Design a protein with these regions (language model features):
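Short, basic/aromatic recognition patches
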Residues: 2-27
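Generic detector of bulky aromatic hydrophobic side chains
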Residues: 11, 24-29, 60-68
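Zn2+-dependent cytidine deaminase-like catalytic core
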Residues: 3-6, 41-92
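Short beta-strand scaffold segments in enzyme catalytic cores
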Residues: 28-42
Length: 92
């Protein structure tokens, strides 16, 4: 059966959907952290927790946005899950 996605293709599709959750108006980025072909965390770029979802762009960069990778790593830390040795799949 040749139509089955390999693991990299599979995670690439999932991280693309994750990026669609981004609240950033300039760029939507998603990140998956994967260990042993299992997703241990995911994140997307967006506004700082507790801040108004208002886009403030200076020098072509959003001013109050947390990176997708930061969100995925922080999620692991909050749940006490080690991300050491994980593979990051990032859309951008």
């Amino acid at each position: 059966m040749t139509d089955r996605l390999n693991w990299d293709e599979y995670f690439a599709k999932i991280v693309s959907v994750t990026a669609e959750r981004s609240s950033c108006h300039r760029l939507h980025v998603g990140c998956l952290l994967v260990k042993n072909n299992r997703i241990i965390s995911q994140g997307y770029n967006g506004h700082l927790p507790g801040c108004k979802h208002e886009s403030i762009i200076r020098n072509n960069h959003e001013q109050a946005t947390v990176h997708a990778e930061q969100n995925a790593i922080c999620d692991c830390a909050k749940r006490g899950v080690s991300c050491e040795g994980a593979t990051a799949y990032v859309t951008h």
